[in-house]
Each structure stands twice: as C-alpha cells, then as structure tokens.
C-alpha cells in the first residue's frame, strides 16, 4: 500500500509539472499585442501623414496646433475626425500570418520601396516613425502590406481605395456650415428676412430633423394676409446647416464664376452675433456651383443638387403663405 501511495504521488507531481510546462509554453507563444500589429510606435504622437501612389501623386497632412491641415491647399482644414480615425486604423492593423517573405514575393505583391500601390509615411517632428507599403489584393476591402522595418508581407483589412491621394478627399467639407440651432436670422435680399423666435425654440434638442415649434420663424416683411410657412422657413435653415463643399477652387475670383451678381445671396446671423454672407453662382460650362462664404478666403465647389436645393428653399412662395 505504501509503495502504491508513493507511485501515485510521483504520478501526481509529473502531471502537475506537465500542466505547468504546457501553460508556460502557451504563454511564450502568445505574443504581446504590439508584436501582432503591422507597425508599433509606442507613445509617439504622429503629426504628419504623407500618402503616395504608384504614379507619384502625393498628399501631405499636417497636424498644427491640434488640428489637421492640408498644406498643398493653403493650409486648408482637413477633416479632423477622418484623419484621426484613419491614423488609428493604421495603428491597429494586425499582421496575421505572412503570405510572402522573399524578395520575389515583395515584388509580386507590390510592396517594395519603389514598387507599390500606396506608401504611407508617419512622421513626428519631421522624423520618420513608420512607413507602410500597400499592394493590391485579390480579396475585396483587403490589401497586401509590409512595414519598411519588416521583410514579410501580410494581408490586411484596408483597401488601397480607402487611402486617397487627392487632397479634396481629405478636406473638411463642412467648413462653411452653420449649426442649425446657431442660426438666429436669415436674410434673402429682395425676398424675405426671417427671425428665429427663441421662446418657441428652447434649443435643448440637437435634432435638426425635428418638427419646428409653432411660430418658430417670423418676419416683419409680410403683407396683408401673409404668414410664414414654418416648414418652408425651417427647410431653408436646415439647408444652410448641411451645406457642404466638395473641393477648394482657390482664393482667386475667375471669370467663369457667375458671381457678379451671384445667383443667390444669403445673410445669416448667428446666436453669437456673427454675420455670415453666402454668395452662390453657376460655373460656366459645369453642372456644379461656386460658393463664397464671408468666413473663408477661398472659393468652393458645391454639388449641383445641394445648390439647386438651396435656391429652391429661398423661393418666397415656399416660405410665405398667402391667404386667398
């Protein structure tokens, strides 16, 4: 009996040793999260992104005083949220299993220093921190990728079309917008002047699709039997609040801009006592429109559907109701 107990004790010790050994082995095989990422930059703050395509086209995004700008567009504001989300996505890219490790594989997958679909350079204080080469993948929404510090190729969840090199793709398209609840008054010269009633609008809701309160908009320019169509007036305010641009046309007035006089002029007063003047006109030979806002030195391209919608919203018959 004593020998049996001794053998069982030895067997138990061996089993415990085996369990501990397996746990240690598995722990050793589980790489830290940072080692599973395509790139790792630690706590370094990236303040510059440069994206280049196979044809040599390039866009540079620079973080200045906490905001992203586009130097090639005269330091025009970039879409801060879009840039930050893109940067975070780059830092979270996982390596997975390599799909190639030889020089021939790097060439075939187009992730070489001079052979790529996209090159993304991340810098801090003008120092290169990380560099990623992207090549095409046969799978949708995927790309072959390699860090400049690695000789292996990995397939990642980021398509090359999600990494544009056109500056307009990174511009803040909302730069001329005025938040809906910040609009205090709207003047359409020669048509109507509207004033917002703050007593009818508590301003507690941020939903610009909400039904306007009774008598939210008023005007002193109404004739006998006329009243404000609240839905129509509110549609105009909402059209201003969602106004977006698709490109920066520069700071110089051109003869093809039909702004002398403009097709539409809007004067908007805000809750902060600021005045913003919008001038909208057609562009000779094009479907889209040109917009000039007094808050910016640039001229902007506005999509045709947004421009025509804004023009229709300023029609007096849409805003003013006449009693028969």
Q: Which residues are covered by each model-predicted region?
A:
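Secondary-structure "cap/kink" motif recognition
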Residues: 1-324
